């Protein structure tokens, strides 16, 4: 069974210690709720990942564990077969003992767009909301973060993350907890909070922004990356049914509308640092994710539109600072 005890020990004497009042029972319930699904099967695979400590790791320019020279061809083949049992791999890529996990998303491209605009992560405590299998968490660690906590309720993402961590070494201060942000108390403790690719999946985007704010210390930095449309501060797309074949897309605002929402939620120093139309090369079918991908979500005769006729995915990165909350505005 996946254990979270090392995380509990690490936060016992930190500014996250009050989380221990509720976290163990919440995670215990999550494990009980998933004991009859795929989780036990994936945990058996994790228990087979007994390999020597890697001769090198790189989280600065990539997520690389091992040089590829430690394992024999047979050992490498066995490891690859085990890692393939966690397919589909969506966020990456990862390089594990010479094995290239070519994920659906080139998450390294997103990181390259974001990292140049954020406050330095050195010695910061970081929260990554909707972290997937943890690719960006490793890159945050490589940027000098003191501790990185990711939350994502998916058991598959948890097991993919655990696979990489067990091969990289359990001592790294990076942790994935299978939670949604609505299960977090207001911690007011993180120096930087990332929410990338989450907002449009939330039925109440304002509530999501308030939940993100509640995790930041005053003066902490929010890094928000999400789908946007063109338009003024009143422009918001609400898909009638599906968007890019996804039935869980609720609100896609313009950059101006999103900045207004953040201001209403008592953020300050709000700025859009990047906009980017998702390229077909950034999200695509691979050997490690053989299902439909972006090309199938777009109009085959006009890739500037989704198959439903909406504008094709365009993403913006917004950075904002948590201001001292105005209780009358928030609660009034």
From Swiss-Prot:
Classification via Pfam families: Methyltransf_9
Annotated binding of carboxy-S-adenosyl-L-methionine, by residue: 91, 105, 110, 130, 152-154, 181-182, 196, 200, 315
Molecular functions (GO terms): methyltransferase activity; transferase activity, transferring alkyl or aryl (other than methyl) groups
Keyword tRNA processing: yes
InterPro entries for this protein: CmoB, Mo5U34_MeTrfas-like, SAM-dependent_MTases_sf
Origin superkingdom: Bacteria
Alphabetic keyword roster: Transferase, tRNA processing
Family: Belongs to the class I-like SAM-binding methyltransferase superfamily. CmoB family.
Protein name as catalogued: tRNA U34 carboxymethyltransferase
Species of origin: Shewanella putrefaciens (strain CN-32 / ATCC BAA-453)
């Amino acid at each position: 069974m996946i254990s979270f005890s090392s995380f509990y020990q690490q936060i016992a004497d930190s500014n996250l210690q009050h989380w221990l009042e509720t976290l163990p029972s919440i995670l215990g319930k999550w494990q009980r709720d998933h004991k009859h699904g795929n989780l036990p099967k994936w945990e058996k695979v994790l228990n087979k990942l007994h390999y020597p400590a890697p001769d090198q790791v790189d989280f600065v320019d990539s997520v690389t564990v091992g040089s590829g020279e430690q394992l024999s061809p047979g050992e490498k083949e066995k490891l690859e077969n085990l890692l393939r049992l966690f397919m589909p791999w969506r966020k990456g890529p990862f390089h594990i003992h010479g094995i290239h996990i070519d994920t659906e998303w080139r998450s390294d491209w997103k990181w390259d767009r974001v990292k140049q605009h954020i406050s330095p992560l050195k010695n910061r405590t970081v929260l990554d909301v909707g972290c997937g299998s943890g690719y960006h968490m490793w890159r945050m660690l490589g940027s000098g973060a003191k501790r990185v906590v990711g939350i994502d309720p998916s058991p598959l993402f948890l097991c993919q993350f655990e696979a990489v961590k067990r091969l990289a070494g359990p001592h790294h201060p990076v942790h994935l907890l299978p939670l949604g942000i609505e299960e977090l108390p207001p911690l007011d403790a993180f120096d930087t909070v990332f929410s990338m690719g989450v907002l449009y999946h939330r039925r109440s985007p304002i509530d999501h922004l308030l939940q993100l704010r509640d995790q930041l210390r005053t003066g902490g930095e929010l890094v928000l990356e999400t789908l946007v449309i063109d338009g003024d501060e009143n422009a918001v797309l609400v898909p009638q049914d599906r968007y890019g074949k996804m039935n869980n897309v609720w609100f896609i605002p313009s950059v101006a509308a999103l900045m207004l929402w953040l201001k209403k939620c008592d953020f300050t120093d709000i700025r859009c640092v990047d906009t980017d139309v998702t390229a077909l090369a950034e999200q695509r079918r691979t050997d490690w994710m053989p299902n439909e991908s972006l090309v199938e979500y777009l109009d085959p005769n006009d890739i500037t539109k989704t198959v439903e006729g909406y504008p094709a995915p365009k993403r913006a990165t917004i950075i904002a600072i948590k201001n001292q909350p105005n209780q009358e505005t928030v609660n009034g």
